[in-house]
Curated annotation (Swiss-Prot):
Residues 17-28, 449-468, 501-717 have a biased composition (Gly residues). Residues 301-439 are annotated as: Coil 2. Heterotetramer of two type I and two type II keratins. It comes from Mus musculus (Mouse). GO terms for biological process: intermediate filament organization; skin development; spermatogenesis. GO terms for molecular function: structural molecule activity. It holds the Pfam family Filament. Expressed in footpad epidermis and testis (at protein level). One of its GO terms (cellular component) is intermediate filament. The gene is Krt9. There are two types of cytoskeletal and microfibrillar keratin, I (acidic) and II (neutral to basic) (40-55 and 56-70 kDa, respectively). Residues 1-130 are annotated as: Head. This is Keratin, type I cytoskeletal 9.
């Protein structure tokens, strides 16, 4: 998600949540080396330590917007990077100069030079870069771009029309056959297939019924055969009984024959005896004997015969009756068993039909169950897929909503930042107008100094070195060296060093440091001398001398003997007898005899009272000091702020103000520290310090022991008599350049 685009704004070209820039920008190769930045919103890389300070798109509203304000489109760090003319990178040209190698020393320099091709210099050169000209240039270029877009769209439409005409004329023709006359035949065949299918099913059902009937008859036949075998066994048993009876009958007949033969023999013998007895008694002999009458044997035998015949007939009748009764019973049993068997067979056939129907119904239910289970599984899979798609859409929409919310928050925060910057710029412009109206006479006495990739005018005793400042003599301090730095003489302190900073002599404190530091060397802080207070360097803190406060580290503020201010991203501690103020993202601790105060992202405090600014709060000096700033102020300045000194001093300045013991002004982007008892100091991007007066220059600033002011980009030195106007000059030049950069 990119918070800003490079098509229609003054910010640098963007990348994904990081710094912008690159070799494609119109600012040239040196600009491309300064404007690369990381995703986290940090400074972009480059040859000239452009990642320090607020370089390379580090200041973006959403934490990583590509090449935001004070970032990649202006070059690298707050020192050397701005000497390459990288400000000219906006939209491939634009106005060069300001913050990019075009601005000269003091109020006399014009904007122009290096890679930007801005407007020429002269007196009042700061005001010649009119924003209306820039807007007209941008509007004209936008109009040309829109005309080109319209022309390309018209040509694209014409080409599409030509392509469609070509395809309509030469495109392949597709011939479709008319197959409607086959539809009736296909329908008839489908009907026949359906009829044959129905018939086939009916035939299969009949075959199944016939098979079942055949099975029933087979079972019935088996049962009849078993019954027949049982009846045959009974008949065989009865035949044995009949044979026994026949044998008994034959035995009785034989016995009867034997008895008849015996009877005949007895009858014959009796007759013979009777004849013999009658033959012997031919004479009449009457003998009367009184005897019992004799038994008639014939009658007895006849009686016996009749009796036996009756017995035989009776036995025969009994046997016949018993046989008939038994046969009747057996026939009745056979009839009953046949009926029962028939009824049982019917029941069995019915049960078999029922079982078959139940089996068919069971198979149907099983088939239906399997089909329903399959349909249920398909439905589950389909709805699971739909649910997964819906969940993915929900997650995508939630991610988009989160991105929209984050972008809305970024835009809201950016809007609030731009609104506050707009308000502050309007106030600063009004202040600059008042200052310029009062200091118009100082422009006429400005000297000439040369800065790499640009030209301008400066004041007295300023000589330009390569890419930056010059060197000064004793009792006035100087600046110079490569890319902005230099060394100063004794009794006045110097400013410079690589990319902005330098070291001063005794009795005057030190100022400068790489990329905008207050005092000390690069990426650290040094300590100031006695009775003058020191200012902190970039990315680290510095410590003040005896009877003076300490100043915090990175991005920020300086301190003096009247009260110390904490820098951003680290915080500092105040010195004795004056109290200290906490820096942003860390807070600070106050010294003895002074209170502590916490602001948003760090607040500051003093021994007498103060007011908190937005995003960090600031601290006011004791006995009447005024302070207040936005975006981190310790007293005054935004993004780091400094603290005001004792006995009435005021401090201010953008992005890191300075402090003084008697009244000083903070510079932008690092600020400087003022001297003792009256001097004012403060420069943009690293202001200078003085022990008795003087003002720090922009981009590194200089210092003087009794007067003098630091020039831009490392700046020159001023004489004692020019201290006040030089201070105004530096402040005005600094703030006007800051105004151009923010715009």
């Amino acid at each position: 998600m990119s918070c800003r685009q490079s098509s229609s704004s003054f910010w640098s070209s963007s990348s994904s949540c990081g710094g912008g820039g690159g070799r494609g920008g119109s600012g040239g190769s040196m600009r491309s080396s300064f404007s690369r930045s990381s995703r986290a919103g940090g400074g972009g890389g480059g040859r000239f330590n452009s990642s320090s300070g607020f370089s390379g798109g580090g200041f973006s509203a959403c934490g990583g917007g590509g090449g935001g304000s004070f970032g990649s489109s202006y070059g690298g760090g707050y020192g050397g990077g701005f000497s390459t003319g990288s400000y000219s990178g906006m939209f491939g040209g634009g106005s060069g100069g300001g913050f990019g190698g075009g601005s000269g020393g003091g109020f006399g320099g014009g904007s122009g030079g290096g890679f930007g091709g801005g407007s020429g210099g002269g007196e009042g050169g700061i005001l010649n870069t009119n924003e209306k000209i820039v807007m007209q240039n941008l509007n004209s270029r936008l109009a040309s771009y829109m005309e080109k877009v319209l022309e390309l769209e018209e040509s694209n439409t014409a080409m599409e029309k030509q392509i469609q005409d070509w395809y309509s004329k030469r495109g392949p023709k597709v011939f479709q056959k008319d197959n409607t006359h086959y539809y009736d035949t296909i329908e008839d065949l489908k009907d026949r297939i359906v009829d044959l299918t129905v018939r086939n099913n009916k035939t299969l059902v009949d075959i199944d019924n016939t098979r079942m009937t055949m099975d029933d008859f087979r079972v019935k036949l088996e049962m009849e055969q078993s019954l027949r075998q049982g009846v045959e066994g009974d008949i065989n048993g009865l035949k044995k009984v009949l044979d026994d009876l026949v044998m008994a009958k034959s035995d009785l007949e034989i016995l009867l024959d034997s008895l008849e033969d015996e009877k005949n023999a007895l009858t014959k013998n009796h007759k013979e005896e009777m004849s013999q007895l009658t033959g012997q008694n031919d004479g009449d002999v009457n003998v009367e004997i009184n005897v019992a009458p004799s038994t008639d044997l014939t009658r007895v035998l006849n009686d016996m015969r009749e009796e036996y015949e009756q017995l035989i007939s009776k036995n025969r009748q009994d046997i016949e009756q018993h046989y008939e009764s038994k046969m009747t019973q057996i026939e009745q049993q056979m009839t009953n068993s046949g009926q029962e068997m028939e009824s049982n067979m019917k029941q069995v056939s019915q049960l078999q039909h029922t079982i078959q129907e139940l089996n068919v119904e069971l198979q149907t239910q099983l088939t239906t169950k399997s089909a329903l289970e399959k349909a249920l599984e398909d439905t589950k899979n389909r709805y699971c897929g739909q649910l997964q798609q819906i969940q993915e859409q929900i997650s995508e929409l939630e991610a988009q909503l989160a991105e929209i919310r984050a972008e809305t928050e970024c835009q809201s925060q950016e809007y609030s930042i731009l609104l506050s910057i707009k308000t502050r710029l309007e106030k600063e412009i009004e202040t600059y107008r008042e200052l310029l109206e009062g200091g118009q006479q100082d422009f006429e006495s400005s000297g000439a100094g040369q800065i790499g990739f640009g030209s301008g005018k400066g004041r007295q005793r300023g000589s330009g070195g390569s890419y930056g400042g010059g060197s000064g003599g004793s009792y006035g301090g100087g600046s110079g060296g490569s890319y902005g730095g230099g060394s100063g003489g004794s009794y006045g302190g110097g400013s410079g060093g690589s990319y902005g900073g330098g070291s001063g002599g005794s009795h005057g404190g030190k100022s400068g440091g790489s990329h905008g530091g207050g005092s000390g060397g690069s990426y650290g802080g040094e300590s100031g001398g006695s009775h003058g207070g020191g200012s902190g360097g970039s990315y680290g803190g510095g410590s003040g001398g005896s009877h003076g406060g300490k100043s915090g580290g990175g991005y920020g503020g300086g301190s003096s003997s009247g009260g110390g201010s904490g820098g951003s991203y680290g915080g500092g501690s105040g010195g004795s007898h004056g109290g200290g103020s906490g820096g942003s993202y860390g807070g600070g601790s106050g010294g003895s005899h002074g209170g502590k105060s916490g602001g948003g992202y760090g607040g500051g405090s003093s021994s007498g009272g103060g007011s908190g600014g937005s995003y960090g709060g600031g601290s006011g000096g004791s006995h009447g000091g005024k302070s207040g700033g936005s975006y981190g102020g310790g007293s005054g300045g935004s993004y780091g702020g400094g603290s005001g000194g004792s006995h009435g001093g005021k401090s201010g300045g953008g992005y890191g103000g300075g402090s003084s013991s008697g009244g000083g002004s903070g510079g932008s982007y690092g600020g400087g520290s003022g001297g003792s008892h009256g001097g004012k100091s403060g420069g943009s991007y690293g202001g200078g310090s003085s022990s008795g007066g003087g003002s720090g220059g922009s981009y590194g600033g200089g210092s003087g022991s009794g007067g003098g002011s630091g020039g831009s980009y490392g700046g020159g030195n001023r004489r004692p008599s020019q201290s006040q106007s030089s201070s105004k000059s530096a402040d005005c030049d600094d703030d006007s350049q800051e105004h151009k950069m923010r715009y």
